[in-house]
Regions:
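Elongated scaffold/linker segments in the mid-to-C-terminal portions of large proteins
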Residues: 255-453, 460-462, 520-573
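Short coil/turn linking the two alpha-helices of tandem helical-hairpin repeats
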Residues: 119, 142-149, 203, 220-232, ...
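Membrane-proximal, proline-rich intrinsically disordered regions
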Residues: 4, 17-63, 346, 484, ...
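"A position-specific structural signal for the A-helix of alpha-solenoid helical repeats
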Residues: 126, 133, 140, 216, ...
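Sec-dependent bacterial lipoprotein signal peptides
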Residues: 1-15
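Aromatic-residue-lined binding/catalytic grooves and analogous aromatic/hydrophobic interfacial grooves
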Residues: 18-19, 199, 211-259, 274-275, ...
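Conserved, well-structured interaction surfaces
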Residues: 79-146, 175-183, 192-203, 439-444
Length: 573
């Protein structure tokens, strides 16, 4: 049985065991090495093709484990484990994340191993693309399956390093166990540096490039830069250095505020801020994709999509921190440009309500929407039992009020009634939809310039260069919030302000949960939703990492060590 599973592992988890298995035709290794220019385009398209399937679970395991979204209720779908933190090794979405990632690594590695460098700038560039994809995938793997870098990286395990098809794949195959977190990071760095060296041709954001490698290196080194309280200044400086290369290249520019509010609608070719994305096109995006793709869970657009996940109350509160964003169609006012990616589903009759979040018990919060009447300065609302309440103004201009409800004072807003899914108002998320105005078409963003400024801001702060950090932080903040820049930044507030801006800016790009834990912070999800609202997930929790898929362990030709199954197995130092 183990022999059968080993062959299955070779064929599935490490696809491309020989070149005939690669997409786009059957080509022998001899044909490719003798005339690489005739075949490389098709072969590399095969590498990029793996990313299209891989990027779906990549998004879900990165975003759903954070605090930017909530779901309408419990679900039998495997992704609910990401939300609930009920980790199991038998999860088909994590299996796809693993399988298609290793397929991409295997195909990229086989091309690297077959083609000699130095034949032409075009061939070297294509080899660089392969190195980029491999390095990027190893990094995405190690942050999902490995502990945060500041936690004993030479002891904790990353992922297996398998660069190409082993010689004896159909014989007595043996592969080494998982490399350490540090070794996996070094593999990613070496690949990305090689990619940076080889790539000299920029084919646009849908393809790997020198800048894409530099952008990813800025993030990798940032992940290695320790916490704000105990920074690793060597890696923080390297994060600055690689961010400088991207920013100073002049090849990318931040979109204007007006255009940034439409960021999701631009194709990669028409977006000056995008550095590398996993390109999707309408012709390959079926009706099925509009429901089961990432955007389909966040919204129903034109009758397409489930629309069962919404912006969390915590994220909405962050958006409203500097002034209320009013989404009502006849009073539309966006204070924070990031609020343009949120679309409440207002009821057609535009019934005025007072909406607030009330505490139902010590551990459960929920939304309330009470019918409201505004008569000059006098505002009242009525609950479902017919009890009337007079509201106290906090800001009449922004229509923010307080209510004394069941002996507790709550703050809320006058708004139109938002349609409910079960008991939750539908704050649809459109950041992963509407590319080219095509319903839920979306090319997942891997790197864009906005992130690079924030990478550099954080790295500067960890180096104690707070003036430089403030400049970068405000570059991003003031793009979204006119006049919203901070006056000062120092050791007392840098971590909180920079992390808050990363949350606002990079929401729904699969970054949030990793950002929280890599800086040693807890994840607090005290907001309405079916998750355990009272549970604070610490950075030391064993559930910070995902389990290695059990099928991968069963099929692995050698020992493949599982992650800890409780906190007693976690190594912190």
């Amino acid at each position: 049985m183990k022999k059968i599973l080993t062959i299955a592992f070779a064929a599935a988890a490490l696809t491309a065991c020989d070149i005939e298995r690669l997409p786009y035709g059957s080509m022998s290794a001899e044909q490719i090495t003798n005339d690489p220019s005739a075949s490389l385009d098709a072969l590399i398209n095969g590498v990029y093709a793996q990313l299209k399937t891989w990027s779906d679970p990549m998004h879900r395991c990165g975003e759903y484990a954070g605090d930017n979204m909530m779901i309408r209720g419990s679900s039998t779908d495997a992704f609910f484990e990401f939300i609930s933190y009920s980790r199991t090794p038998n999860n088909y979405r994590l299996q796809n994340f693993w399988d298609y990632g290793y397929k991409g690594i295997a195909q990229a590695s086989n091309i690297i191993n077959m083609i000699e460098e130095g034949q032409s700038a075009e061939i070297d560039n294509q080899l660089g693309e392969c190195y980029y994809v491999r390095g990027m995938l190893y990094f995405y793997f190690v942050r999902a399956y490995g502990r945060p870098y500041y936690q004993a990286p030479n002891k904790n395990l990353g992922v297996p390093i398998v660069n190409g098809t082993p010689e004896n794949v159909m014989g007595d195959l043996f592969l080494e166990d998982r490399a350490t977190v540090h070794e996996t990071y070094m593999q990613a760095i070496n690949d990305l540096k090689k990619a940076e060296q080889l790539m000299t041709i920029d084919k646009g954001a849908a393809y790997a490039s020198k800048a894409a490698a530099q952008a990813m290196l800025s993030r990798v080194y940032l992940y290695m830069s320790g916490t704000y309280e105990n920074p690793n200044t060597e890696y923080a400086q390297l994060a600055v250095d690689y961010a400088n290369k991207v920013i100073n290249s002049g090849n990318y520019s931040l979109l204007s505020r007006e255009n940034f509010m439409k960021y999701n609608t631009f194709t990669p070719e028409n977006n000056d801020e995008s550095i590398f994305v996993v390109k999707r096109v309408a012709s390959e995006f079926s009706g099925y994709d509009h429901y089961y793709g990432v955007g389909g869970m966040y919204a129903n657009i034109g009758g397409m999509g489930w629309g069962e996940m919404f912006a969390s109350a915590k994220y909405i509160e962050l958006l409203n921190e500097t002034g209320r964003n009013d989404w009502r169609p006849d009073n539309y006012k966006i204070v924070d440009a990031r609020a343009a990616f949120i679309e409440p589903t207002y009821r057609a009759d535009h019934q005025l309500v007072f909406r607030f979040i009330k505490r139902d018990s010590e551990t459960v919060e929920n939304y309330a929407q009470f019918d409201a009447v505004k008569n000059g300065a006098n505002v009242t609302c009525t609950d479902a039992e017919g009890t009337s309440y007079t509201l106290t103004a906090v800001s009449e201009e922004e229509e923010i009020y307080t209510i004394n409800y069941n002996g507790v004072t709550y703050e809320g807003v006058l708004d139109y009634f938002i349609n409910l899914n079960r008991v939750y108002p539908q704050f649809y998320i459109t950041k992963c939809s509407r590319e080219g105005e095509d319903s839920h078409l979306h090319s997942p963003v891997i790197s864009r310039l906005g992130e690079i400024y924030l990478n550099r801001a954080e790295a500067y702060a960890k180096l104690g260069q707070y003036a430089n950090a403030l400049t970068d932080l405000n570059t991003i903040r003031e793009r979204s919030i006119v006049g919203g820049g901070y006056a000062s930044l120092d050791a007392s507030n840098a971590g909180d302000l920079i992390d808050k801006e990363r949350q606002l800016e990079l929401a729904y790009q699969a970054e949030r949960s990793y950002d929280v834990f890599r800086n040693g912070k807890p994840l607090d999800r005290t907001f309405p939703g079916p998750h355990n609202q009272a549970e604070i997930v610490e950075a030391s929790d064993y559930r910070v990492t995902y389990y290695i898929p059990q099928n991968a362990i069963n099929a692995y030709p050698g020992t493949l060590t599982q992650n800890p199954t409780d906190n007693s197995g976690v190594i912190l130092n």
